[in-house]
UniProtKB/Swiss-Prot annotation:
Domain of life the protein comes from: Eukaryota
Sequence positions bearing Phosphothreonine: T57, T59
Protein name: Elongation factor 2
Gene name, Swiss-Prot/TrEMBL: eef-2
Organism: Caenorhabditis elegans
NCBIfam families assigned: small_GTP
Keyword Phosphoprotein: yes
Record note on modification: Phosphorylation by EF-2 kinase completely inactivates EF-2.
Length: 852
């Protein structure tokens, strides 16, 4: 089926049990886009002969040049299963039925919406956006380098979003041709990767959860093996089918024998689970040996043997392919024998959930409102006749400058051209008017890699693009027709924007264009932050050097179209305290009638991370939350119940606790104190950076009897001053962000790595050899501040043999007292204050502390 007509696709969209929404995720350079090509060529949008070289989903010019994927792109595929394969599609909501001659049969056409996502850690926000709109993930692992740090990060994100994984081991051609591994070694390599992936799944998911068991296991067929570049792949099902007739057993029974410790004795023709001299492992004997035989015959140019194999396996070579030899013949041969497209599409159809199955258990993760209102029920049943609920996960720039398609997924109802809908931004609160627009949707479109197709309407369970809502949304949001609908939950990113660059226009007259360009940039990338400082600076914050480089290039060439001046990258810091305040701080209100007494103290280790990770949440039921705090962090239960709020922004990693005893009018000023606390934690006392891991205690409050003398104008500034004073008396410190660096290199280059890391205040905490290969993996912590130019430095010191991957990992205290002149933190504070246009020098305690 080469020519897709929109009507045919539209008909398929209604068969929601036969839809599979999936994304391809992996570590950088493990071959996602190349593998996606063989899927796309099978579904007939690229010509089959070009697959493996075109990287169809890398739509941007810089993606083709750098050979990396930067933005995630979506594409729809159509695939028809053969009759014999339909029995492998199990589960009541996994297939539609059609009537054939009065009998009900499974419908064999599947619509697969595939999203190819980037593997580079700087773009992991793109991955998050892709995961939100899909239900299944194809995890690609390079079988030579194994499970890497980024594989773990994306897999963890997938499981947190309740997305079911299937595994594919890529680059088998390298394992056979470059490393020349034997059959048993190759089996051990595969088994180790499967174990590693299952360890990650077990760590972050649970088998008794609503998704059921999601472990990957080759013997059920949710693990594929192959080579994306050469365009061939298999699961154990393909081989079991070849032998099933010969052995006279069922395919699924045979699959169990083709993996793990199952050995086949050639003399007695029996399977056993112990190895004897006569027996050989099933996987090696029946799966790998035939492949090794083909490789041996073709690569060593044994013409007669090759001809015999061609005949035996029933491969039809075209006339111009008969004269090939060596690697080109290898590709053609394997591609005809074990075509990657068929294998992968079958695995997707069998093992990934349909929207109907997935939305049952994903609804509670996705929807913020009550789980029994009309919208929630419609999402849960994926009901095309319910109210429209659609989540927009990102904006895709169009060829028309400055306009965007909104890209997202319809969870319930139908979205149609020209319909009126409510567009709810991330800050929308039900019942209020802010961040809410009621507008018509101009067009609904189908996303097809590099092309788009207009379409009348799109029902639930599908991925869609919308035209005409981009003016009302910044990065994402919810589109609905149900007036009481709550928002779909905002995405949690695994990295945080810690590197900043200030930009200005070379020609001051271009300033309006720059501002407009920054607004567009903020739309087009789910992660980047554009900040307009009060000092007039324009700041772009990103996840790392590469991310910022791409953002600035986009800004200069696509969004603002003007020449720019860029500052050197600077790092965001956080402020914290190290001990409890050495006195109870007091501040009086401007009219001297109200007094607040407070202290600050550091939080126990791990609590700030728990708040950011969502384990301890501002929206939790307060008794349940107090219980967690008391058990895990040894907080006093009565105090833990009296948490007034989290900050900054109501969700940040700082706490405001009420430890007062019997104070009058306390509730009346609570809002004002909370506002002061949000202000103080958002702009810390040292250098206006966010605070992190500080717990403030309100000890006593003396208030004026007249309500008019204790309004917000009196209390808010006072609260901020008393919080600043309590920080300054509690040994303030700066926190700097730290990358976790994973470096792969040959043994000879390890020495050079240590040298580079030591010069940059980094330290290695783990070094291990990748079993079965000469490569070493070095893991180290490296402060973000020292990471600029790290890659180039590392390559020059190791002769270009080491490849680093940096992921933001944690915050650590910068050694030294920022209040003491001449220390490094003090220098950073002074530089930051100067850059932000604040008063020079750290403010003295007397500015904030009042005498009785």
């Amino acid at each position: 089926m080469v020519n897709f007509t929109v009507d045919e696709i539209r008909a398929l969209m209604d068969r929601k049990r036969n839809i599979r929404n999936m994304s391809v995720i992996a570590h950088v350079d493990h071959g996602k886009s190349t593998l996606t090509d063989s899927l796309v060529s099978k579904a007939g949008i690229i010509a089959g002969s070009k697959a493996g070289e075109t990287r169809f989903t890398d739509t941007r010019k810089d993606e083709q040049e750098r050979c990396i994927t930067i933005k995630s792109t979506a594409i729809s595929l159509f695939f028809e299963l053969e009759k014999k394969d339909l029995e492998f599609v199990k589960g009541e909501n996994q297939f539609e039925t059609v009537e054939v001659d009065g009998k009900k049969e499974k419908y064999n056409g599947f619509l697969i919406n595939l999203i190819d996502s980037p593997g580079h850690v700087d773009f992991s926000s793109e991955v998050t956006a892709a995961l939100r709109v899909t239900d299944g993930a194809l995890v690609v692992v390079d079988c030579v380098s194994g499970v890497c740090v980024q594989t773990e990060t994306v897999l963890r994100q997938a499981i947190a979003e309740r997305i079911k994984p299937v595994l594919f081991m890529n680059k088998m051609d390298r394992a056979l041709l470059e490393l020349q591994l034997g059959a048993e070694e190759l089996f051990q390599t595969f088994q180790r990767i499967v174990e590693n992936i299952n360890v990650i799944i077990a760590t972050y998911g649970d088998d008794d959860g609503p998704m059921g068991p999601i472990m990957v296991d080759p013997s059920i067929g949710n693990v594929g093996f192959g080579s994306g570049l050469h365009g061939w792949a298999f699961t154990l099902k393909q081989f079991a089918e070849m032998y099933a007739g010969k052995f006279g057993v069922q395919v699924d029974k045979l699959m169990k024998n083709l993996w793990g410790d199952r050995f086949f004795d050639l003399k007695t023709k029996k399977w056993s689970s112990t190895q004897t001299d006569e027996s050989k492992r099933g996987f090696c004997q029946f799966v790998l040996d035939p492949i090794f035989m083909v490789f041996d015959a073709v690569m060593n140019i044994k013409k007669d043997k090759t001809a015999a194999l061609v005949e035996k396996l029933g491969i039809k070579l075209a006339n111009d392919e008969k004269d090939l030899e060596g690697k080109p013949l290898m590709k053609v041969f394997m591609r005809k024998w074990l075509p990657a497209g068929d294998t992968m599409l079958q695995m997707i159809a069998f093992h990934l959930p349909s929207p109907v199955t997935a939305q049952k258990y994903r609804m509670e993760m996705l929807y913020e409102g009550p789980h029994d209102d009309e919208a929630a029920v419609a999402i849960k049943t994926c009901d095309p006749n319910g109210p429209l609920m659609m989540y927009i996960s990102k904006m895709v720039p169009t060829s028309d400058k400055g306009r965007f398609y909104a890209f997202g997924r319809v969870f319930s109802g139908k979205v149609a051209t020209g319909m009126k809908a409510r567009i709810q931004g991330p800050n929308y609160v039900p019942g209020k008017k802010e961040d809410l627009y009621e507008k018509t949707i101009q067009r609904t479109i189908l996303m097809m890699g590099r092309f788009i197709e207009p379409i009348e309407d799109i029902p639930s369970g599908n991925i869609a693009g919308l035209v005409g809502v981009d003016q009302y949304l910044v990065k994402g949001g919810t589109i609905t027709t149900y007036k009481d609908a709550h928002n779909m939950r905002v995405m949690k990113f695994s990295v945080s924007p810690v590197v900043r660059v200030a930009v200005e226009a070379k020609n001051p007259a271009d300033l309006p264009k720059l501002v407009e360009g920054l607004k567009r940039l903020a739309k087009s990338d789910p992660m980047v932050q554009c900040i307009f400082e009060e000092s007039g600076e324009h700041i772009i914050a990103g996840a790392g050097e590469l991310h910022l480089e791409i953002c600035l290039k986009d800004l200069e060439e696509d969004h603002a179209c003007i020449p720019l001046k860029k500052s050197d990258p600077v790092v965001s810091y956080r402020e914290t305290v190290q001990s409890e305040s050495n006195q109870i701080c007091l501040s009086k209100s401007p009219n001297k009638h109200n007094r607040l007494h407070c202290t600050a103290q550091p939080m126990p280790d791990g609590l700030a991370d728990d708040i950011e990770g969502g384990t301890v949440n501002a929206r939790d039921e307060f008794k349940a939350r107090a219980k967690i705090l008391a058990e895990k962090y040894e907080y006093d239960v009565t105090e833990a119940r009296k948490i007034w709020c989290f900050g900054p922004d109501g969700t940040g990693p700082n706490l405001l606790m009420d430890v007062t005893k019997g104070v009058q009018y306390l509730n009346e000023i609570k809002d004002s104190v909370v506002a002061g606390f949000q202000w103080a934690t958002r702009e810390g006392v040292l250098s206006d950076e966010n605070m992190r891991g500080v717990r403030f205690n309100v000890h006593d409050v003396t208030l004026h009897a007249d309500a008019i003398h204790r309004g917000g104008g009196q209390i808010i500034p006072t609260a901020r001053r008393v919080f600043y004073a309590s920080v300054l008396t509690a040994e303030p410190r700066l926190l700097e962000p730290v990358y976790l660096v994973e470096i792969q290199c040959p043994e000879a280059a390890v020495g050079g790595i240590y040298g580079v890391l030591n010069r940059r205040r980094g330290h290695v905490f783990e070094e291990s050899q990748v079993t079965g290969t000469p490569m070493f993996v070095v893991k180290a912590y490296l402060p973000v501040n020292e990471s600029f130019g790290f890659t180039a430095d590392l390559r020059s010191n190791t002769g270009g043999q080491a490849f680093p991957q940096c992921v933001f990992d944690h915050w650590q205290v910068l050694p030294g007292d920022p209040l003491e002149a001449g220390t490094k933190p003090n220098q950073i504070v002074l530089d930051t204050r100067k850059r932000k246009g604040l008063k020079e020098g750290v403010p003295a305690l007397d500015n904030y502390l009042d005498k009785m």
